[in-house]
């Protein structure tokens, strides 16, 4: 462009003369390939923006935009001119215009040299003006041009006026859907001249402004102008500071804006900005989404080359496909000016001793090497000075190699001189800054062992030099009269058809077998044809020139998709004569290494970039090696050795090039290689498409200089890019993107009917591209029939772990009943996004844009405390050491043997296990208006059989490689399942760095054991069993107390290893677990804790399966802890591990948490959270859920996992302080109730206790919000001596958690040491509180809002979560209950009974004795709870839990309730009232059940259905109201209130002090769109059941919080059938055979399943009559979650 400078300074007279000649038009001859010249009239349009010609059959295409002209050359320089005979044309009358992405040439011949000179001068002047204008001027110019062009195109009759009919047609073209009356009204307002009925251009501009008034911008202006129609200077400054987040805003700057953008002179005088000026400003580059500062180089350019991504081109000389296209030197000029810094030159021997450049063994055209070097020399540093790497692929003889070296030195001269370059530290590559203006030659270098005097030597030739594999080579043997022309013409026809067929496949398809098959078939056909037609008599002679004998190797497809090249040996003749024998076979071992001769002159030009052949990562310690990998080989390396690869890339350069099978020049996905730190990822710049758009976006930042600094984490240290939380210690970024509106979105470019097509129905999709864990996408709803100014007003939220390498891609689609059509896109690096109100202009479209509001928050995940609290690093280290073991452990459950064994490759991508597939519910695709859940975007090209942990399904849904998703019976509360099933295996906990509990001293032994046992053969067997029993387990877990989130080794041991023992005597078990001091880790305490107890109970359930293995496990409790989790827990943990990946965490900082926690009553302050944090939380859940079984459990688990048991971590930090680690009962488990479940509750309760716990943890916790699906654990209970306020707060929390058995301090085992508050606290609910906070961040407000029981719709991704306020419900609709579970639960009942007989501590049972008579209570109690639809409250659960929790306690002496606060009425809404439906999946037709009807009741709830109300319940509720047992202590009394059926009382008491107005409204899941008829049908059935139930249940006073779901009367056998396969069992105090409700049969059960055996809840009567109730019925609302 340097030569254009001259034209900027032309005299105005000369410029005008040129312009007038060009606009009036000139007759010229247009040369085309293969035809005679065509005479055409060429002219410049009146706006001087297009060169046009006529006549033309396609007038629309007969134009070239001045903007698209790349260069204009004089004389006969183009290839087409070269094909013409010398004397045909006068060179001074010839010139060529190069334009477009593919450098198409327009070759013109004028009648005289003067005309040619005029056109060349005029065109270069226009190009100079364009290159010189700033972005604002360009935007204004293009806008004006667009309006003028629009007017001209609408003027069909060419009279310069538009009538009303032409306006209507224009409206349709512009995708405006306005009533004709409205259009006519605007038309009349704009038509002001005497010529009524038509609009001139000026009138059309007025009309267009009316039509395009931006309502969204107008409202924005009003909001900052105090309802005026203009902004003053001060108001504008305020807007820029507050909304646009601009710093250093001065009044002068604001005045400049007014002067520059305001249209009205009157406003300029007043120094105010009106709506037109404001619109102009908002549409200007100043408010573009891309940071204007990044148009310049802003990064540190003094680091070694290996610390940068470098823009690289593959086969730069080609203009099209790899087989037939033209090679052009201009392509080098083009890509260098686009910012590419590494170009490729394939050198081959040419005629006359002149090396040529082309793609070997193909029919691409040849260009001279000398011309290429001259072009590179001329254009290398036009746009920037940073170094250019010349990748020489040398296939030449020694003589021509010397010629190459000669040209390089002679033409490039001092650009090759690197002697002055400062390399800085020894053995380090120089920096881009120190190499400015230099050209590096990348090529082979002679080995060092050769003396300096050696003129030549041999080097390996096995690298990308010979990219085309033998199967694709054309070695054309022609002889005996067959001419080259004959052969080429035949082949060309075949290849053209081949290329056409190859277009069938998606260009981005990484692994096109279609093309491979076509290639082979074509080659074989060609070979056969030539054999028939060519009498090859002299087969022994060497062929001269090109020969066509294709070498067809058997291309073996490895499972890993690795393809090794089939190189021929040194004696190539043999392979040519025996095609299919040596030439083609892959005989790696037997073949000789291919070598080539290299001359010293060329070798000496290679300094820092020595090409090394590589089948693997080889670091020989020398600086300056560049490894070259084909994309397929690189893919394997990235998958198998990502961390090793990253370390290599910290010292050396790596180049990745496209597979030889990409004959159509398609591009692979560069992301996986960038993520592994590869610097030179070479793409085909001539091929437009998604991958080049991503590449362009990546390098556009930093001034488009071709060098982008890698993140520091990639330059030092290492991390696993496939991990679910690759950088645990680093804060993440949260992107909150509000998509407001669109402007002038055109019809799809490939629209069949063009402008006459239908008005589009646009929607916006936003995709995050980066690390696998960050890759996801979300979309807005569809706006029908409006492409001109659609309004979406939707917020999308994303969490990004490594923002430095992430890109944000905005896509606009036209929704179509049978798919969607691409309208436009824009891709921007995350780091270049600017916050505030921004326009995103779509690439390549003049006016089309979308208007968004961007907020970027920094959020701290569970690991951020590492930064703030160095003591965490030890925990981190200890946890990390278990990471690999855990991977191995997970592998045991993975049916894919290859992955299971790869413990060290933790990042290996896993396929979903069979269990996953079986348990996965059918999920319908989102309907048109419905938001899709975040979709995972795994672009890894070759990943087909193995997908990384962050891997996603092909369908795009973010897939956290969850182990087979555990089925939680719907009848089991999620938290139970979570807690029980979730308890991490010890090692897992260990692995979870969060499970820092491991760090407790007492725990270390266990951890060691865990590791050892993990490898125990028993374990694998055990796991197998577990897999079968896991469902049962889960089931049982449902009944267990909230099991600890950390599986207690003991617990587990108790559960698993000891299952046998426990069976006879749980008490003993507990003792065993707890007595030996050396095993007494906090986890063991769990055994006593409610949570622990739950685990142990689970044990009972498992005993049958595990019995035979019990002996093996007795000593290996820790192991058990892992195993006990059972597959479910493992899976859970998997979920956890991988889950954290894609979810959008809320941005919640420590301060936020403390603030929230510190002031409980004032929840309004947290209201803001609802919109963002909470919805994000919800989104988080939704995000992974959508493709998991759809169960809330999965979501919760995910959340849990995300937090990786932050609770545990938290605990650790405190526990670690305690003297006796063993003593700290790991209440982390408490995560079970609140912490895990709803930390919301815990959230609410902040107490100093909490604050005492490390605040850091809180922060971290905060980010791992748990979706609203679960209620948190009990809140912390300080010891009596603690600050009263603490107590109060604690109580508050407890009050809120009526359902949590754990709320009762009495249940917490005491630490041996009296003074260890913290341990105790941790044990106590307080601990959970904090823990809870982490998972909870969901929405403090939510928990409070019980009284209002309002349903709110949540925007954003939370579509699947519904939060109802009234009562706590959790469910996993997708959970199926298998007969096995039923059986096991019965067994559990039996165990419990035995345990009771063997001395369970009765005095600890709940005062209400609700469960005294029901050994199996736990088994069934939870069922109610789980039925979200029924709205079961936690109370049942808590009671059963409480009892069970206490059952184990006697074994461990309980300190007096010193840590337990005295219960007092809570000031908060009862948690019981908190209804947290879990995210529900999109259900397939048979899946919708009554459980999908969420009930919201205003006040006490009565039973909806008699079928779920039993006499036991009635009696119990009556007795509970009339009589209460004497509490053992105040806390127990409080607990009794919380868990008793007397919900009415407890609700009143708890809520009495809570101001209704203080309760923020709860969030509710958005309903997905489903068939209306189904919805109506379900609603009507529910209503009928409700009516029927009302009459019978009139007199019944059931506890207020329990809503029993009604079921239609059914035959005796099919009691309470649910499509989810869950069964409902009640935990009733009285075991009246007839009065108990029956369990439903699992969906698809083979038989009716007489499950009465040992099942005290079993009853064949599905419909239980209830007596009429005199009490008033509350109004019932049903929320159909579809």
Swiss-Prot record:
All residue ranges annotated as the PH domain in the record: 20-128
Catalytic activity: a 1,2-diacyl-sn-glycero-3-phospho-(1D-myo-inositol-4,5-bisphosphate) + H2O = 1D-myo-inositol 1,4,5-trisphosphate + a 1,2-diacyl-sn-glycerol + H(+)
One of the protein's GO biological processes: intracellular signal transduction
Tissues of expression: Expressed in brain and to a lower extent in lung. In brain, it is found in cerebrum, cerebellum and spinal cord.
Binding site for Ca(2+) 4: 814-816
Binding site for substrate: 442, 444, 628, 655
InterPro entries the UniProt entry points to: C2_dom, C2_domain_sf, EF-hand-dom_pair, EF_Hand_1_Ca_BS, EF_hand_dom, PH-like_dom_sf, PH_domain, PI-PLC_fam
Active site (UniProt): 314, 358
Biased composition (Polar residues): 1040-1050, 1065-1074
EC assignment: 3.1.4.11
Binding of Ca(2+) 1, residues: 155, 157, 159, 166
Positions of the UniProt region annotated as Disordered: 534-588, 992-1083, 1296-1321, 1581-1603
Keywords attached to this entry: Calcium, Cytoplasm, Hydrolase, Lipid degradation, Lipid metabolism, Membrane, Metal-binding, Repeat, Transducer
Single Gene Ontology MF annotation: calcium-dependent phospholipase C activity
Role description: The production of the second messenger molecules diacylglycerol (DAG) and inositol 1,4,5-trisphosphate (IP3) is mediated by calcium-activated phosphatidylinositol-specific phospholipase C enzymes.
Protein name: 1-phosphatidylinositol 4,5-bisphosphate phosphodiesterase eta-1
Source organism: Mus musculus
Lineage: Eukaryota, Metazoa, Chordata, Craniata, Vertebrata
Gene name of this polypeptide: Plch1
């Amino acid at each position: 462009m340097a030569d254009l400078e001259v034209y900027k300074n032309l005299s105005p007279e000369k410029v005008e003369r040129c312009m007038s000649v060009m606009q009036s038009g000139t007759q010229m001859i247009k040369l085309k390939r293969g035809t005679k010249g065509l005479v055409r009239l060429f002219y410049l349009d009146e706006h001087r923006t297009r060169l046009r010609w006529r006549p033309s059959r396609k007038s629309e295409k007969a134009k070239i935009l001045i903007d698209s002209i790349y260069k204009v050359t004089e004389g006969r320089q183009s290839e087409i001119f070269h094909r013409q005979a010398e004397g045909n044309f006068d060179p001074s009358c010839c010139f060529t215009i190069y334009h477009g992405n593919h450098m198409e040439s327009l070759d013109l011949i004028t009648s005289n040299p003067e005309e040619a000179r005029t056109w060349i001068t005029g065109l270069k002047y226009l190009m100079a003006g364009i290159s010189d204008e700033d972005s604002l001027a360009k935007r204004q110019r293009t806008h004006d041009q667009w309006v003028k062009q629009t007017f001209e195109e609408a003027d069909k009759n060419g009279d310069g006026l538009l009538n009303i009919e032409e306006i209507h047609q224009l409206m349709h073209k512009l995708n405006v859907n306005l009533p004709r009356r409205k259009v006519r009204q605007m038309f009349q307002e704009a038509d002001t001249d005497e010529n009524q009925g038509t609009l001139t251009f000026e009138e059309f501009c007025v009309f267009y402004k009316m039509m395009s008034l931006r309502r969204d911008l107008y409202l924005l202006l009003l909001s900052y102008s105090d309802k005026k129609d203009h902004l003053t200077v001060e108001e504008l400054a305020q807007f820029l500071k507050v909304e646009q987040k601009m710093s250093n805003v001065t009044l002068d700057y604001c005045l400049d804006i007014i002067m520059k953008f305001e249209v009205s002179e009157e406003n300029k005088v007043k120094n105010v900005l009106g709506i037109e000026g404001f619109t102009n400003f908002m549409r200007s580059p100043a408010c573009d989404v891309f940071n204007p500062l990044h148009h310049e180089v802003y990064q540190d350019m003094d680091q070694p080359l290996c610390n940068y991504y470098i823009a690289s081109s593959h086969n730069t000389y080609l203009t099209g496909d790899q087989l037939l296209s033209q090679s052009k030197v201009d392509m080098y000029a083009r890509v260098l000016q686009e910012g590419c810094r590494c170009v490729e030159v394939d050198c081959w021997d040419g005629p006359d001793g002149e090396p040529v450049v082309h793609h070997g063994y193909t029919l691409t055209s040849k260009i001279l090497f000398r011309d290429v070097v001259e072009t590179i020399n001329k254009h290398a540093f036009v746009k920037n000075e940073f170094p250019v790497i010349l990748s020489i692929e040398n296939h030449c003889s020694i003589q021509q190699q010397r010629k190459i070296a000669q040209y390089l030195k002679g033409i490039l001269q001092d650009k090759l001189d690197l002697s002055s370059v400062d390399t800085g530290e020894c053995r380090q590559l120089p920096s881009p800054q120190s190499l400015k203006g230099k050209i590096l030659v990348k090529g082979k270098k002679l080995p060092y062992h050769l003396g300096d005097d050696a003129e030549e030597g041999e080097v390996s030739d096995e690298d990308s030099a010979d990219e085309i594999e033998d199967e694709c080579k054309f070695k054309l043997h022609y002889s005996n009269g067959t001419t080259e022309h004959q052969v080429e013409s035949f082949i060309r026809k075949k290849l053209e058809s081949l290329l056409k067929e190859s277009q069938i496949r998606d260009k981005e398809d990484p692994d096109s077998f279609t093309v491979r098959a076509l290639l082979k078939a074509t080659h074989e056909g060609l070979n056969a044809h030539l054999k028939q037609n060519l009498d090859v008599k002299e087969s022994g002679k060497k062929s001269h020139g090109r020969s066509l004998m294709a070498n067809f190797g058997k291309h073996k497809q490895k499972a890993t998709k690795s393809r090794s090249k089939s190189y021929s040996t040194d004696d190539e003749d043999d392979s040519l004569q025996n095609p299919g024998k040596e030439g083609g076979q892959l005989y790696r071992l037997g073949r000789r290494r291919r070598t080539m001769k290299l001359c010293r002159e060329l070798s000496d030009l290679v300094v820092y970039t020595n090409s090394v052949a590589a089948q693997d990562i080889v670091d020989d310690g020398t600086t300056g090696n560049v490894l070259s990998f084909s994309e397929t080989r690189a893919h394997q390396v990235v998958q198998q050795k990502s961390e090793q690869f990253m370390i290599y890339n910290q010292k050396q350069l790596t180049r990745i090039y496209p597979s030889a099978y990409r004959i159509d020049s398609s591009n692979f996905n560069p992301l996986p290689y960038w993520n592994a730190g590869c610097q030179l990822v070479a793409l085909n710049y001539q091929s437009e498409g998604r991958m080049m758009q991503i590449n362009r976006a990546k390098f556009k930042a930093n001034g488009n200089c071709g060098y982008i600094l890698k993140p520091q984490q990639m330059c030092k240290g290492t991390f696993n890019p496939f991990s679910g939380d690759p950088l645990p210690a680093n804060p993440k970024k949260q992107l909150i993107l509000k998509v407001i509106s669109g402007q002038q979105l055109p019809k799809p470019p490939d629209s069949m009917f063009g402008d006459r097509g239908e008005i589009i129905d646009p929607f916006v999709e936003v995709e995050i591209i980066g690390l696998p864990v960050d890759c996801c996408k979300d979309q807005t709803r569809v706006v029908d029939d409006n492409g001109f100014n659609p309004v979406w007003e939707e917020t999308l939220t994303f969490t990004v772990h490594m923002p430095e390498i992430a890109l944000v891609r905005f896509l606009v689609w036209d929704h179509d009943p049978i798919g969607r059509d691409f309208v436009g896109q824009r891709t921007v690096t995350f780091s270049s996004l600017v916050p505030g109100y921004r326009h995103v202009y779509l690439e390549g479209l003049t006016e089309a844009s979308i208007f968004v509001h961007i907020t970027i928050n920094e959020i701290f995940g569970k690991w951020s405390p590492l930064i703030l609290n160095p003591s965490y690093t030890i925990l981190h280290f200890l946890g990390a050491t278990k990471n690999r073991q855990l991977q191995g452990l997970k592998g045991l459950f993975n049916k894919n043997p290859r992955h299971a064994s790869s413990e060290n490759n933790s990042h290996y991508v896993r396929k979903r296990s069979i269990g996953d597939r079986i348990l996965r519910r059918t999920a319908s695709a989102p309907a048109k208006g419905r938001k899709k859940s975040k979709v995972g975007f795994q672009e890894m090209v070759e990943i087909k059989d193995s997908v990384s942990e962050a891997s996603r399904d092909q369908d795009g849904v973010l897939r956290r490689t969850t182990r087979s998703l555990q089925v939680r019976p719907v009848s089991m509360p999620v938290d139970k399942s979570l807690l029980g099933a979730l308890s991490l295996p010890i090692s897992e906990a260990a692995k979870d760095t969060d499970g820092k509990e491991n760090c407790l001293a007492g725990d270390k032994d266990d951890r060691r054991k865990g590791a050892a046992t993990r490898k125990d053969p028993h374990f694998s067997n055990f796991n197998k069993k577990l897999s079968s029993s896991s469902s049962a387990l889960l089931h049982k877990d449902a009944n267990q107390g909230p099991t600890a989130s950390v599986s207690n080794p003991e617990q587990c041991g108790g559960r698993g290893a000891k299952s046998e023992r426990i069976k006879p005597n749980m008490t003993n078990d507990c003792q065993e677990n707890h007595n030996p001091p050396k095993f007494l880790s906090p986890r063991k305490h769990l055994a006593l804790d409610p949570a622990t107890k739950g685990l142990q109970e689970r044990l009972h359930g498992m005993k049958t399966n595990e019995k035979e293995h019990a002996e093996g496990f007795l000593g290996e409790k820790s192991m058990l802890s892992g195993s006990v989790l059972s597959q479910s827990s493992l899976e859970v943990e998997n979920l956890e591990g991988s889950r954290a990946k894609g979810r959008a965490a809320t941005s919640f900082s420590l301060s936020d948490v403390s603030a929230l926690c510190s002031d409980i009553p004032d929840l309004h302050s947290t209201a803001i959270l609802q919109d963002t944090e909470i919805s994000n939380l919800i989104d988080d859940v939704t995000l992974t859920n959508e493709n998991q079984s759809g169960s809330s459990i999965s979501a919760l688990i995910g959340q849990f996992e995300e937090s990786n048991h932050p609770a545990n971590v938290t605990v650790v930090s405190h526990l670690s302080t305690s003297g006796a680690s063993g003593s700290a009962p790991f209440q982390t488990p408490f995560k079970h109730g609140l912490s895990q479940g709803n930390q919301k509750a815990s959230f609410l309760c902040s107490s100093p206790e909490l604050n005492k716990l490390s605040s850091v943890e809180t922060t971290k916790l905060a980010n791992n919000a748990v979706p609203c699906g679960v209620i948190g654990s009990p809140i912390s209970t300080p010891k009596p001596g603690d600050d009263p306020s603490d107590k109060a707060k604690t109580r508050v929390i407890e009050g809120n958690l009526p359902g949590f058995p754990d709320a009762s301090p009495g249940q917490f085992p005491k630490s041996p040491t009296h003074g260890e508050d913290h341990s105790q606290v941790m044990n106590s609910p307080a601990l959970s509180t904090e823990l809870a906070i982490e998972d909870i961040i969901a929405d403090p407000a939510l928990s409070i809002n019980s009284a209002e029981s309002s349903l709110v719709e949540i925007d954003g991704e939370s579509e699947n979560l519904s939060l109802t306020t009234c009562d706590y419900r959790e469910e996993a609709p997708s959970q199926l209950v298998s007969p096995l579970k039923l059986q096991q639960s019965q067994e559990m009942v039996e165990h419990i009974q035995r345990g009771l007989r063997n001395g369970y501590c009765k005095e600890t049972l709940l005062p209400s004795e609700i469960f005294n008579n029901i050994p199996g209570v736990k088994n069934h109690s939870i069922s109610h709870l789980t039925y979200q639809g029924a709205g079961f409250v936690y109370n049942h659960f808590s009671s059963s839990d409480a009892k069970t929790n206490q059952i184990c306690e006697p074994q461990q002496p309980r300190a007096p309730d010193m840590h337990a606060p005295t219960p007092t009425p809570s000031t908060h809404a009862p948690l019981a009232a908190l209804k947290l439906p879990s995210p529900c999946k999109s259900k397939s037709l048979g899946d919708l059940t009554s459980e999908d009807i969420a009930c919201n009741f205003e006040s006490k709830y009565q039973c909806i259905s008699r079928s779920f109300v039993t006499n036991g319940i009635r009696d119990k509720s009556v007795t509970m109201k009339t009589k209460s047992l004497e509490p053992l202590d105040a806390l127990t009394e409080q607990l009794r209130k919380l868990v008793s059926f007397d919900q009415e009382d407890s609700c009143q008491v708890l809520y009495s002090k809570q101001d209704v107005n203080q309760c923020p409204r709860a969030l509710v899941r958005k309903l997905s769109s489903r068939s209306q008829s189904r919805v109506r049908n379900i609603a009507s059935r529910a209503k009928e059941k409700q009516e029927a139930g009302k009459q019978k249940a009139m007199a019944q006073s059931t506890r207020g919080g329990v809503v029993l779901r009604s079921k239609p009367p059914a035959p005796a056998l099919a009691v309470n059938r649910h499509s989810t396969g869950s069964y409902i069992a009640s935990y009733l105090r009285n075991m009246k055979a007839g009065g108990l409700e029956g369990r439903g049969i699992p969906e698809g059960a083979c038989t009716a399943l007489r499950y009465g055996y040992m099942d005290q809840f079993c009853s064949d009567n599905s419909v239980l009559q209830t007596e009429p109730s005199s009490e008033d019925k509350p109004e019932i609302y049903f929320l159909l979650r579809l």
